[in-house]
Amino acid sequence: MKTIGLFYAMNAAKTSHIAEKIREDLGGVKVIEVVLIEKAWQNDFQAYDNMIVGASTWFDGELPTYWDELLPELRTMKLKGKKVAIFGLGDQIRYPENFADGIGLLAEVFEEDEATLVGFTSSEGYTFERSKALRGEQWCGLVVDLDNQSEQAE
């Protein structure tokens, strides 16, 4: 079994791009196994002690439908002892009132499931009004704004 499960949606082009970049940077197929959200089940989340999960933020701060369909199932799991790092995409210019909320929504679910969130990053350098992804002055994951700060994704 691989040591890290990387969960994201294949049909979300920007999220897929960032997920593949993360996978390459962390050691590729020897270390990370991809689990596509469109095909994921509860036991997929139970299979890994370390997970990286990714999602974009849609519309008014919502998770994409492929995550929404899994949320009821995810809310019933207990993930105590498992570590979860979250990454997500947002657009701080077009959606400053709910920038990268998808990360925060996922974080809430994994926190309820008693997982340990890792990978907090600085919110410095971003311009926005509100975000559910903020914990104090930090993001509860890696925030990527490919539309306005694409150079930071490299």
Q: Where do the PLM segments sit?
A:
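Short acidic active-site motifs
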Residues: 39-44
